[in-house]
Regions:
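Short, basic and Ser/Thr-rich N-terminal targeting/leader segments
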Residues: 52-54, 124, 232
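Long, positively charged amphipathic alpha-helical accessory segments at protein N-termini or as interdomain linkers
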Residues: 2-14, 18, 93-120, 130-268
Length: 268
């Protein structure tokens, strides 16, 4: 067992070394790749307190305490997912935190498209989905967490992307989930991480290019949705996404509601 553990640690270290070398010309901070960690998001939030550089990256082959939206547990199996977090240093006066999770979701879809996966869409706010027989199947989840001091924030955005399912459907029998292995030949995990991180460097949040790309890949816009916010439920047409990432829904009476948090169900 000790030898197998050492092999896992060395394999992860090697992947991190290769990735750091490939991304050296770009403006990334520390890039770490572990065999196992509690949570890549928490790793970077802790490092933020010590003042580590902008665009630090944490990747793991396995997480033991991963979290999804609404404090749900994020379940993954060893070496079956890309588990990656990126830290941004943010001026809250000019850049809403929500735009950084949008930035990561668009970067992932664009990177996957370049690797041959062209049918992946974004379900608001930032789930990546595939569509089988008219039903949405979750391929990846994105979670943003932050520490705020005055008008400055350290924002950590984490990604859990299913590469293969192994036994995940047995563990989550009631969930509609998917993996890259079900829709094509899974890419090398280093190539995948590199592609996503390169895409992150493309977008300047001070122009409309990010929003335009988000709308291009959105599966939610133009569909009828049921929205659940706190204890309120309403239905309408998903019309557009605002500059801060909120979803605008047109109700049957012609009025519009803007939501920044909540669960949506696609009706048709």
């Amino acid at each position: 067992m000790a030898i197998l553990k050492l092999i896992e640690i060395f394999s992860s270290w090697r992947k991190g070394r290769v990735l750091r070398k490939r991304l050296k010309p770009l403006d990334f901070g520390e890039i770490s790749w572990k065999s196992t960690t509690g949570s890549t998001n928490q790793d970077l939030l802790l490092k933020a307190q010590s003042g580590t550089n902008q665009l630090s990256v944490a990747i793991a082959d396995h997480q033991t305490a991963g979290k999804g939206r609404e404090k749900r547990q994020w379940i993954s199996e060893k070496r079956s997912s890309l588990l990656m977090s990126v830290r941004f240093e943010v001026d809250l006066v000019s850049d809403p935190i929500s735009l950084y999770s949008m930035k990561l979701s668009v970067s992932v879809v664009r990177a996957l498209e370049m690797l041959g996966f062209s049918e992946i869409k974004i379900k608001w706010p930032n789930d990546l989905v595939t569509i089988h027989d008219g039903e949405l199947h979750k391929l990846a989840g994105i979670l943003a967490q932050s520490t705020i001091k005055g008008s400055h924030a350290s924002v950590v955005v984490g990604l859990g992307l299913n590469i293969s399912l192994v036994n995940l459907r047995t563990l989550l029998p009631d969930d509609h989930i998917s993996a890259l292995s079900e829709i094509g030949q899974p890419p090398d995990v280093i190539d995948l991480a590199e592609g996503i991180l390169r895409e992150i460097c493309v977008f300047d949040l001070k122009n409309d290019s990010l929003l335009a790309e988000y709308e291009k890949y959105s599966h939610t816009l133009g569909t009828h949705v049921r929205v659940e916010v706190d204890e309120e439920i309403f239905e309408g047409l998903a019309k557009r996404v605002t500059q801060t990432g909120s979803l605008v829904v047109k109700l049957d009476n012609g009025s519009e509601r803007e939501i920044s948090v909540g669960e949506i169900i696609h009706l048709r």
